[in-house]
């Protein structure tokens, strides 16, 4: 008993009592490592953000470069304006026709029970439109046709990881569109003098951001198509490309001022929105007599404005996703010294219509409307 007590006493004497002010070296090392890891993570996050910003700009620049290269290669394969024999320009007429051309979405493919659309059907529908314009021209004694191009001639796939890989497809789709529109212009030129104006749409922009400045808004496939047609028809008698603007454009026909918009800047109250926009010009002393726009893919012609439908008609997204059905149609307006008569030309049924010839090997599509039906789901997400 006494021996055990003596051992416990010796053990207590051997114990070292640490003063609270003396720091544990292991704990200090651990804290230093944690601070170092946090600093490294902060630097890694900064580098990741900087690399992402550079990567996005580099992808866009590489995609545009590849697109231009492919486009030049395709242009070298065709003779755009050789061998043209144009009829003489009509010397007089009592009317001018305005063809409201918008939302053509050439590279969209639709295969529904109620509607089909591809490049061939687009060529048929434009051929049908030209025949209706010619009929109206004969009835009203028109000498000139003004084509107002209101944008969204192509669907653009703006996902950065697909921009470069789809450069060939987009260049081919651009030239398919040019080929069909070239035939459309030449068809009308058989009977009329032609003037063409153009603006950009929202769906055919190259960048994913919707821009309102001229620099951003003009980065569009609509401008590319317009410029190719303009250069291809340079020097052609009776075909004049008069002007292109990013968002809004004015032109005059028989003393009337027309305003061109795409339509994505117009709100739910169409009449109010149109009057607000024309009010800007009234403040500058410019009276707008009629406003032309599209965007919504549904025809609506009023006293002071006309909304165009699309050349496509209903697609998978509009029918299944929005429960919204529409027909393929474009507007034509007959302008005389005292009147502006507008009408919708129904282009849905093209049975028996011969399509314009185009290079079928250039067909390339963007299945954008069907992809809108698939809602992405995030399996695992880290938010910083």
Residue locations for each model-derived region?
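Conserved beta-sheet core of the metallophosphoesterase superfamily
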Residues: 215-246, 254-362
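Core catalytic region of metal-dependent phosphoesterases/phosphodiesterases
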Residues: 54, 83-104, 112-229
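A short, hydrophobic/aromatic-rich structural module that often spans a beta strand
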Residues: 198-205, 357-365
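Conserved protein kinase catalytic core
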Residues: 109, 158, 207, 268, ...
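Catalytic phosphate/metal-binding cores of nucleic-acid and nucleotide-processing enzymes, i.e., regions
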Residues: 127, 175, 188, 355-358, ...
